[in-house]
């Protein structure tokens, strides 16, 4: 009998077929940042003040500036108050009465708001996301993050049920059509509902494409392939800065960012299914046909005897979530990893969503944020090889946290310094996220790896949901968000000292293996592909690419 791992060895770990697949999936990762972060550029701050309709309704021969003086008080800086207006005088009051009696009692705006005349439509000025509605711009991001959580829970099982290709195509169609529909919404409530819907598709996409990639790429290239795919997410952030700069009209920006999905209709024919998934479903003929195509593209010859001995893949034994808490050592690992993923998400999205709050041009800052993620993600591979998983995870978390803490003490009139610190923090959190995928998968035993990675993914999404709400705390004190983004990663990083090192160790298969302690393995005796595949096999996106602690 032959298993798929043996066939993959003959096809090649990373040939032309896998490179073509990587490119197809990189395009999807490249498009994803628009859905995550474009909203930030649609709600940028802009001058506004209460509408002065009552003045205009009088037949006063006043200039616009004089009308403003009569209707809107000034703040301490001498600018019109954005959320207050003078209480209107009686309808029959004359201009002399108004000037002599000085109607100067204030009240919240009740006649709408006015914005600069040359403004372009934005979510903020079209739906009046100001004053008592200001919180909605951050609440919308929490709704989006909640959609990511639902999408992860929904499309994960669906990916195993109907296949990787079908799931990816369905998600591509969903987030493209919903994204285009978002550009034509008549109300902000409908906009929020569609943001939730598109988030479910985007979350499922990140799950499905990593799964498909890791099931076709061999052990020696899996980690590098996944990191390369993640780097395209960073490149997408850089392009988003240019798009947002060029299209200030939020509806045009929404259409421009989502329409490219329509050009990917050829994925229906170009994207391959996972041969391993076909084998687990007993669809032998389709799997063999796909394997032969992969071998042909890679210019490799398949042994007829090996193909004749190919048998359906069998799913190994699995545990349940409660098993993660029954074993003392595993319970400690699980709780700490929950904390790590929670703060990974909190810090990463916290800095990303506050890209306009560091003092420099928001478009330039977004470009820099995307650019620094590429070396950050790539360098994480070398850090894990040089310093091990534990110390790399600890170092990146603490570094990211310290940058956020230091920002609190930097004066606002030094925007370059603040932005530089934020950039270093963004690099550290991006690297920490990448390390978490590898380290977490190696810490869980094989029978619980899929369950464990699924649960840490949930905690990551919870961190994302809370991130915009943490930003709202800045209304009470400007330092609170950065204090939280800084202190929690430092605490989580210090907790990593309690975790075991996994670099150079054999992967654990069962709970009993945890009792045996570490099993060091010489780098020269890297495990066979069959062994590593058996130990790393899973359908979880954070798991399948970890088949050995050497890469």
Curated annotation (Swiss-Prot):
Organism: Homo sapiens (Human)
Pfam families: Sugar_tr
A GO-annotated cellular component: apical plasma membrane
Tissues of expression: Ubiquitous. Highly expressed in kidneys and to a weaker extent in brain, heart, and intestine. In kidneys, expressed in proximal convoluted tubule. In kidneys, also expressed in cortical collecting duct, whereas glomerulus and thick ascending limb exhibit no expression.
Compositional bias of kind Polar residues: 537-551
pH dependence: Optimum pH is 6.4 for urate transport. Optimum pH is 5.0 for p-aminohippurate transport.
GO molecular function, one term: urate transmembrane transporter activity
Keyword S-adenosyl-L-methionine on entry: no
Name of the gene encoding the protein in the UniProt record: SLC22A13
Spans within the Cytoplasmic topological domain: 1-20, 160-167, 217-224, 273-332, 376-397, 449-452, 500-551
Official protein name in the record: Solute carrier family 22 member 13
Stretches that traverse the bilayer: 21-41, 139-159, 168-188, 196-216, 225-245, 252-272, 333-353, 355-375, 398-418, 428-448, 453-473, 479-499
